[in-house]
Amino acid sequence: MAISDVPAAAGTTATTTSDSDLRQPSLRRRSSAGVLFDAARDSGSDNSLTGKITDDDNIKDHKPNNHAASDDNVGAAANDAGQEHRQPVADFKYAYRPSVPAHRRIKESPLSSDNIFRQSHAGLFNLCIVVLVAVNSRLIIENLMKYGWLIKYGFWFSSKSLRDWPLFMCCLSLAIFPLAAFVVERLAQQKCISEPVVVLLHLIISTVELCYPVLVILRCDSAFVSGVTLMLLTCIVWLKLVSYAHTNYDMRALTVSNEKGETLPNTLIMEYPYTVTFRSLAYFMVAPTLCYQTSYPRTPSVRKGWVFRQLVKLIIFTGVMGFIIEQYMNPIVQNSTHPLKGNLLYAIERILKLSVPNVYVWLCMFYCFFHLWLNILAELVRFGDREFYKDWWNAKTVEEYWRMWNMPVHKWMVRHIYFPCLRRGIPKGAASLIAFLVSAVFHELCIAVPCHMFKLWAFIGIMFQVPLVLITNYLQNKYRNSMVGNMIFWFIFCILGQPMSVLLYYHDLMNRKGEVD
C-alpha cells in the first residue's frame, strides 16, 4: 500500500489495484465518515475540512490514464470486504493530522456579551433548580427545627368562615343579575324598550350587583378569606355583565348598519340577524373568559385523566402556598413594625426578608389560578382558547407585563375600555390612564372591603404603575434589547411593592382590630 504524495486528510485511505502492471495509488473516501465528522465538529463545525478532502480526491482521481482509474475503482470495490476491518485504524491514523488547521474562523466565547443570549442555558437552568430545591429544603428543615409547626388551621378552615351564611347567600344571589340582564336584552331585541332605556337598565343592574356584596361584607363581621372570595366573584360577574351589555349593544348597532347597506370589515364574524339566547349567556357565565361572544372555540371532549392530574397539582401547590404563608410570612409580619412609622433600617430589613417568601407565594398563586384552575375550568366546559397568560416573566417594560400576565382582564380592558376611548377621540395616554384607574379601583375593592378599611394602598400601588410604564418604556427605547426594564419590574413587584403592601395592610388591619376591641 502506497500513500499519496498529496497530503491526505482525515477519513481517507490509500489502496492499490490488483493489476501488477498498474501500481498507481488511488485515494478513496470511506463509506462511513463518522471520524471525519467528529474532526470537523472539533475544528469548528464548518465545511472547510470536507471541502479540502473533496479537492484532494479530485486531484488524485484526475489522471490522464482513464484505464488506470477504472482499474482502481474495480480494485477498490473488490477489496471492500477486506478493507472494512482496517477502516477504524486508518481513520484514527489520519483523522487529526497536525497539518490540518485547528482555528479556521473568528468565534466568540459562549458567555461573552455578544454571544450569551444566543446560547441554550438549559443545563444552567437545571442547576438553578437543583440548587433552589437543595437550599430551600435546608431552610425548611432549619425553620421547623428552630420554630416548630406554626401553621394555624383557623385562618383557612375556621368555623367562622363556615357560619358566614349572609356571604354565602349573597354569593348565590349573584345569579339574579345575569338573568335580569338577559331579560333586558330580550326586550331590546324585540324592540319593546328604547336604546337609552336599555343602557339605563344595564347601568342599574351592574351597579347594584357591585354595591350589594360590598354592603353585605361591611355589615357582617366576616372572615377575611370569605370576604375576598365573595369580592373576587362579584368583580368577575360585574366584568361579565358589562361585556354582555356592551357586546349586545355593539351587535345591535352593527345590525342597523348592515340593514342600511353599509360595508362592514371582514374581521367581524356574526350572523344576521343576531339572536339573544339564554344558553349563550349561561355558557359565558361559567366559561373562563370575561369577553362575551355568541360562540367560542370548543374542544371535542373532556380529558378526565388530565383534569384529575391538574386537580392533584392544584391541591399540592395550594398547600405549599398556605405553608409558606403560615410558616414564614406570618411570623415575619407579626415581628415587624409599621413601615412608615418605625425605624427605617429595620423596615427595610423586614421588607427584604419578606420579599423571598412573598415571591414564592405570588408565583404559586399565579400557577394555581391562571394555569391550573383556569385550565381545569376550560377543560370541563370544553373552552378552546387557553391563552390565559403569556410569557410575562420576560417582559422588558411594565407595560408589557400588564399586557401579558392576565390575558382575560387585558382583553376585557382593550375591548371595553381602551379602544372605546380611542373611538371617542380620547388620546392614547388618557385611555391608558383610564384603564389603570379602573384596575386600581377594583384592586382596592378586593382588598379594602374584606379588611373593612379603605387606606387606598392598593389603589396607589396600581396608579404608581403609570410612571413606571413611562420610565421603563424610556429605558427600553434608549437601551435597545436590554433587560433593564425586566429587572425594574421584578424589583418593584416582588422585592419592594408587594412586601410593602403586605406590611402596610397588616399593621393597619391590626390597628383597626385593636381600636374595635
Curated annotation (Swiss-Prot):
Entry EC number(s): 2.3.1.20
One biological process term in Gene Ontology: triglyceride biosynthetic process
Biased amino acid composition, Low complexity: 8-17, 71-81
Biological pathway: Glycerolipid metabolism; triacylglycerol biosynthesis
InterPro entries registered for this protein in UniProt: Diacylglycerol_acylTrfase1, MBOAT_fam, Oat_ACAT_DAG_ARE
Cellular component per GO, a single term: endoplasmic reticulum membrane
Broad enzyme group: transferase
Coiled coil location: none
PANTHER family: DIACYLGLYCEROL O-ACYLTRANSFERASE 1 (PTHR10408:SF7), STEROL O-ACYLTRANSFERASE (PTHR10408)
Function description: Involved in triacylglycerol (TAG) synthesis. Catalyzes the acylation of the sn-3 hydroxy group of sn-1,2-diacylglycerol using acyl-CoA.
Similarity-based family: Belongs to the membrane-bound acyltransferase family. Sterol o-acyltransferase subfamily.
Stated name of the protein: Diacylglycerol O-acyltransferase 1C
Organism: Glycine max (Soybean)
Lineage start: Eukaryota, Viridiplantae, Streptophyta, Embryophyta, Tracheophyta
